[in-house]
Amino acid sequence: IRDRRLKGRQNLFILSVSKASNWIQEGGRSVYRIAVLAEQEAERQRYAEQITRFCESKGLFPQVVQYDDQERFFEAAQKDAPTNAVIALSGVAGLNAAEHLRSLCPVCRMIWCSDLDFSLHAFRLRADYFLLKPVSEEAFQLGLFTWLA
């Protein structure tokens, strides 16, 4: 069952919580393959560190891969689809990336961070969480909680 509520709270939008499988069974254990796509190295690193800390606190040990360009990200996604992805690109580039990711990986869990309010597009694309930049650590962590729902 999908809960398709749109709730605004400062720069935070809860879009969709789905029960789609967001893990892959490898060798008898669950593996999260999480892709982080962002233009700025500091931003990619910050999201990757927050994801790793959050998952480790839950007893999960994800494979987090960072990408700085969409072409490499989508080539990798076609070969080995991520279970989860964070898209943090500015403007229409973020919208295009979110649309392309959804077409390639229909069940991939997605957190989308943008400087423009694409919350309705994020809802249409079944993003789990949409955040307007600047994104606080607390707001991002709430997005990560939706991945465990």
Task: State what each model feature region is.
Residues I1-A35, Q45-A48:
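Non-catalytic signal-transmission and effector/linker regions of two-component phosphorelay proteins
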Residues A38:
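Conserved acidic carboxylate
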Residues E41-V65:
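Two-component/phosphorelay signaling modules centered on CheY-like receiver
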Residues Y67-N84:
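Acidic, metal-coordinating helix/loop segments flanking the phosphotransfer/catalytic sites
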Residues T83-L148:
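CheY-like receiver
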